[in-house]
């Protein structure tokens, strides 16, 4: 086992503080509307220019192992806040630095770190309750756009597009962010249920210009096995042909004789038909077929539940007002499923989302949920250069997360004002004298976000803090225009979830760092002397004539 380096007490805490300060000082310059850019060298390609706190934090690795531990702990604050709320990473970093810096001074002066941490925890609990208390639910399109605009570093276009996307697909809907081929940032929405499987043969196309099959008032056959044999499929084809309705077949696969017969019937005009593969794989495929069946009011024709393909009748088929199928996707619009059945299915998927511990499963379940309740919106991000594209895409994703957070838990005045307003709740806390130091640490730290926003805008932070503290409600400092305004009326708002998560995560990690008594790191290996050269090259004597 490799030898270790160990540091104790004040020496350990000082190393942590150096690391925390190095990382936080690099991150906090990006805070607020007048936040500065950070340029990051990349091992390949052009440098990355960003104003995103978590991106800056992720790039930082320090040479000193002990200082690096401090930096990595604060990095965890930024990452956790980003994961939970999607924004607030810089605020969380600023808070963590302020709490730890104040706390480390008190511990160095001989105060009990465990008691300080207890006071800290109780103060945070009271503050979180107060933030929820002053939170306002988000009501309309305009407020959603404001949250999106602020999280996208005051880019109004992005805010408006996110608000429009949420309006179209609902708060349960899936909104994805992709890179556009053009310069403009646009929004595309897909109504109804779409899955990523296209037609099995181009002969099914009804619109050669757009290369898609579009059919109205469609019957839908949903089968969970391969169809290769025509005789199994014949009875249902005959019934559908008699009814005169177009038919969409969704099955694990359709091949050989069955596919050839469908194509021939389509070309002869006997039957308007289209065949696609079932979406997903394994158990997820079964679940998605069941979703389609419920949405269209049909049944999954599966031998597992006693339905054979050859015995299928028209009443087992799903129905939809319209379907469109291109080479990659199938979209089912206005299925005939019963509303009560769809809501029951939605409830079941929501329960599974709450229970699952896998992020991948949760994402897939949310996609299924969105397909049942709303639809899917795609924000296509356009930019002039690749560097701008990456930066803009990251901002859109941030803004999207923050907007979802605002819809979840409401909004509070932005620009660090909410923390100053929530501070009054700390006056009522009756704690032991040592624990009261923890409360004082938090009080001082809560001023730090607004102080940093002001400093980044080139204004004296202390004057701004004092003026805003003496104001009421949403009165605060608009750093973008250098004026004092009602923050909510001016549209400077933060999602409650973001403010809450930033404070909780910062206090949690700062409290742990404060109560650290020892640090252990691997001892760096000493570089030995160069090994001797192989025989014949000793001293390279034979090359003397080259001097």
UniProtKB/Swiss-Prot annotation:
Single GO term (MF): unfolded protein binding
Catalytic activity: ATP + H2O + a folded polypeptide = ADP + phosphate + an unfolded polypeptide
Catalytic EC class: isomerase
Entry's Gene Ontology BP terms: protein refolding
Pfam family, one: Cpn60_TCP1
PANTHER family: 60 KDA HEAT SHOCK PROTEIN, MITOCHONDRIAL (PTHR45633)
NCBIfam families on file: GroEL (TIGR02348), PRK00013.1 (NF000592), PRK12849.1 (NF009487), PRK12850.1 (NF009488), PRK12851.1 (NF009489)
Protein name according to UniProt: Chaperonin GroEL
Gene name as annotated: groEL
